[in-house]
């Protein structure tokens, strides 16, 4: 049931995981967005978009989490919502988008990209607002709220690590850090199989992948970082850490076994970055943003069992 009064985003859940910290040799803080409305940090951005734009119809392309988030946010504000999703998206995410009241347009990404299909729909509905899951100032500002919550808790952090796809979350974090004047390094964790952001930082300009990858971290299957995001990240982000598929899987398993947290593969990327560079973070105060928990049940069961 949709509440009569729109609900703003929930504060992030801070998890102290002493067993996981001991296992890694890191003073670890987990900022879990798995209990956020719609199960991921994406609701922060979606709420900010739906509450600010005047259009009554919002369209987007999403691998799932932003689709769920914008669908629910649109329902809160009485707006129509259309979400273009890859046909390969986890069924749990497709079903959830529909259950929140949005129309889902599935596309075979091997034949046509999500953005191409979104462009076609935008021509059909010229009065609709086309929301990028990441390349939108309203999205970036919505995500910045997460860092501001961390600052209010005075956690004395050395690093904040967050997953990166298009750059919406990390650019929001960097924006908030820069505005605060705090000396905290913001790092991005990216699948090695979908490393457009890492390639971009090495090249000094945006590099696009030729096609979407098949990384298990489906929320990071993007072709390139966003223009608005690059403007912020190119100067403010400390580094992009590339994470292997095995490290992503191990991150999911460790969060379950040692922190009692259910994270989807994309949500475990930040912990995967710690696994990728263990010596760098020894003894450091590190906040890993666990960005979401919308895992396909069958896949999740295999991951936690180490299959």
What are these regions (language model features)?
Residues 1-307:
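PLP-dependent amino-acid enzyme catalytic core
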């Amino acid at each position: 049931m949709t509440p009569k009064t729109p609900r703003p985003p929930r504060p992030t859940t801070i998890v102290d995981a002493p067993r996981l910290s001991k296992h890694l040799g890191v003073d670890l803080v987990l900022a879990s967005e798995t209990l956020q409305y719609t199960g991921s940090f994406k609701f922060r951005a979606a709420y900010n978009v739906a509450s600010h734009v005047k259009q009554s119809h919002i369209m987007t392309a999403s691998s799932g989490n932003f689709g769920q988030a914008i669908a629910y946010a649109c329902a809160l504000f009485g707006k129509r919502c259309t979400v273009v999703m890859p046909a390969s998206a986890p069924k749990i995410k497709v079903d959830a988008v529909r259950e929140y009241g949005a129309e889902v347009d599935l596309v075979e990404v091997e034949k046509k990209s999500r953005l191409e299909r979104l462009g076609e729909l935008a021509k059909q509905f010229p009065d609709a607002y086309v929301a990028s899951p990441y390349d939108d100032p309203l999205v970036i500002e919505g995500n910045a709220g997460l860092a501001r919550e961390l600052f209010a808790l005075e956690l004395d952090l050395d690093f904040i690590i967050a997953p990166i796809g298009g750059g919406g979350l990390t650019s929001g974090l960097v924006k908030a850090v820069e505005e605060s004047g705090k000396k905290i390094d913001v790092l991005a964790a990216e699948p090695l199989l979908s490393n457009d952001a890492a390639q971009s930082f090495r090249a000094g300009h945006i590099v696009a992948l030729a096609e979407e990858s098949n990384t298990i971290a489906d929320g990071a299957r993007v072709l390139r970082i966003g223009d608005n995001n690059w403007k912020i990240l190119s100067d403010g982000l400390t580094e992009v850490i590339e994470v292997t598929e095995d490290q992503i899987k191990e991150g999911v398993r460790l969060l379950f076994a040692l922190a009692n947290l259910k994270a989807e593969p994309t949500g475990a990327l930040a912990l995967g970055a710690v696994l990728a560079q263990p010596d760098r973070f020894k003894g450091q105060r590190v906040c890993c943003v666990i960005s979401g928990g919308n895992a396909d049940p069958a896949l999740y069961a295999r991951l936690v069992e180490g299959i």
